[in-house]
Regions:
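Intrinsically disordered, low-complexity, charge-biased terminal/linker regions in eukaryotic proteins
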Residues: 1-55
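Sec/Tat-exported extracytoplasmic proteins
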Residues: 5, 25-36, 112-119, 154, ...
Length: 281
């Protein structure tokens, strides 16, 4: 079977009357500096995928039929036409019913997000940095995949900062044994002077509970700023409890990419956070 293709977070939708799915899937991602859509959506004029579209990684097929559906239904299959592909089937008795259900349900967005994050985690299996991973294992007793381009490292007390040091799209991973982000960052990530240091825009932070690697994780998404300097960007942190001998362990990624879109860069870096597990497990 041929491997599926498409850009990250690209979705092709079929049968989307009145652009209901389009509006749902292009809603802005929270906690980014500028609005960016959840997905890059292409609406096909066809009712079913044909030709090259059969190889797309993310496909959504919508059917509106009151004789077939008494309520909105969402089902999915994997690897229908190509490897590493998801095809989501959405059925509803009417466009108005579908629109109502899409405003209260995130099931389709969640399915597609898991699909894309899974693809990014799979990429890390082939392109990662064993040297930095050994540093993380030595300091914190955990295993995780670090992107291959992250070659710069700064160690502190119960803290490590790993970065690709790119001047245009800097991606970073920090690990520390605390939930108090501001105190850790003020001590470890400074600007040109001691009066410049990283802080959190507290009004931007969104917290949720997720499950990864069979553990409950507190996920925080928000915006960081550099006090005393015109720098900032998005961050995502995963806080775990009672792992590898640590009462609390936070693994965070943040991005500094002025003047560019940040969704894909942040998500690609966040994939590393989803690979964390206690060493030896």
């Amino acid at each position: 079977m041929t491997k599926s293709g498409g850009r990250p977070f690209e979705v092709v939708v079929y049968g989307d009357e009145d652009s209901v799915l389009y509006h749902s899937l292009t809603s802005p991602i929270p906690a980014l500096p500028q609005p960016e859509p959840s997905f890059d959506v292409t609406i096909s004029k066809n009712s079913q995928p044909k030709g090259a579209d059969l190889l797309m990684r993310n496909i959504v097929i919508v059917t509106i039929n009151p004789k077939t559906f008494s309520r909105t239904s969402v089902k999915y299959e994997r690897d229908v036409y190509a490897k590493n592909q998801i095809v989501i089937y959405v059925g509803s008795p009417s466009v108005s019913q579908l629109r109502k259900d899409m405003t209260t349900s995130s099931v389709i967005t969640d399915l597609l997000t898991r699909q894309e994050m899974g693809a990014m985690v799979a990429t890390l299996k082939d392109k990662h940095n064993p040297k930095m991973e050994e540093t993380v294992r030595r300091m914190f007793g955990i295993e995780m995949r670090i992107p291959s381009d992250m070659k710069s490292c700064k160690e502190g007390k119960d803290f490590v900062w790993i970065s690709n040091n790119s001047p245009t799209s800097m991606t970073n991973i920090c690990i520390y044994t605390s939930e108090n982000r501001d105190s850790v960052m003020r001590k470890n990530i400074k600007g040109e002077t001691d009066n410049m240091y990283m802080t959190t825009n507290k009004e931007s932070v969104i917290s949720s509970i997720a499950k990864t690697q069979d553990r409950q994780v507190t996920v925080r998404r928000g915006l960081w700023e550099m006090k005393g300097d015109a720098m900032g960007g998005p961050f995502v942190s995963h806080t775990l409890h009672d792992i590898a001998g640590h009462k609390t362990l936070t693994i965070e990624c943040f991005v500094y990419a002025p003047g560019t879109k940040k969704r894909n860069t942040l998500m690609r870096t966040e994939a590393s956070l989803m690979t964390v597990k206690a060493a030896g497990r």
